[in-house]
């Protein structure tokens, strides 16, 4: 007899145009699985994935690249993606790295590479953009700049964004709606309400709740794509 555990169950969520919804939870809680079901990469055992999103784009948590292989940004953008040069330059410009068009992929910093990945995903102007841990390998200032970029994309493209992140401080200042998963939805709502929820506190601790309740990144400056500050 084969017994299969369900990775996630009872998941119900809604992502509207121009809205950022963030999935949080411990490792193995079903965040990436949920995202892949929404993208129809994985099939559901029960229930339906419905919506009006005609075009969906995905930036996975990990991407396998042979960093020793000569590969320019413009060529990387075209791999398994039928993009014309106008789409490529426009999307790279939107993510602030259009000057890197002919640079080698292996020469990019962590933040620059993430911006190229996001540019590749938004080149065809998706209705829904799914970002799985989009700031991996990026320093603190770069993280701030990337989360600001994600917010700009949601506004400028009026697309829904499903974000998976462990960076709680940035989640609290960037997202519109938080869903806390641990195999099922433990709690959901606005960031300020979720951090006070008993289920959230049970998972992440009272100190975390008090620290994050309610963090926002206030400033009178902007961040460049490398994380540096411009007045």
Language-model features and meaning:
Residues 85-100:
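Conserved ABC ATPase "signature" region
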Residues 104-108, 112:
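Conserved ABC ATPase signature
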Residues 125:
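Conserved catalytic motifs of ABC-family nucleotide-binding domains
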Residues 129-133:
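Catalytic Walker B motif of ABC-type/P-loop ATPase nucleotide-binding domains
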Residues 165-166:
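H-loop/switch region of ABC-family ATPase nucleotide-binding domains
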Residues 178-190:
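H-loop (His-switch) and adjacent beta-strand-loop-beta switch element
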Residues 203-231:
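ABC ATPase nucleotide-binding domains
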């Amino acid at each position: 007899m084969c017994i299969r555990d369900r990775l996630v169950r009872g998941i119900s969520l809604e992502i509207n145009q121009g809205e950022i919804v963030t999935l949080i939870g411990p490792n193995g809680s079903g965040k990436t699985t949920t995202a892949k079901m929404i993208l129809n990469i994985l099939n559901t055992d029960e229930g339906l994935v419905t919506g009006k999103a005609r075009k969906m784009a995905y930036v996975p948590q990990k991407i396998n690249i042979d960093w020793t292989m000569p590969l320019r940004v413009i060529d990387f953008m075209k791999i398994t993606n039928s993009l014309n040069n106008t789409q490529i330059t426009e999307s790279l410009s939107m993510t602030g790295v259009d000057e890197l068009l002919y640079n080698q992929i292996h020469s990019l910093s962590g933040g620059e590479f993430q911006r190229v990945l996001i540019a590749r995903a938004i080149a065809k102007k998706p209705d829904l953009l799914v970002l799985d841990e989009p700031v991996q390998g990026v320093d603190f200032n770069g993280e701030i700049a990337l989360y600001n970029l994600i917010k700009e994309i949601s506004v400028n493209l009026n697309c829904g964004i499903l974000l998976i992140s462990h960076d709680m401080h940035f989640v609290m200042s960037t997202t519109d709606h938080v869903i806390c998963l641990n195999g099922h939805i433990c709690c959901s709502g606005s960031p300020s309400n979720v951090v006070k929820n008993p289920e959230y506190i049970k998972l992440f601790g009272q100190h975390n709740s008090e620290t994050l309740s309610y963090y926002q990144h206030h400033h009178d400056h902007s961040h460049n794509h490398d994380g540096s500050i411009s007045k």
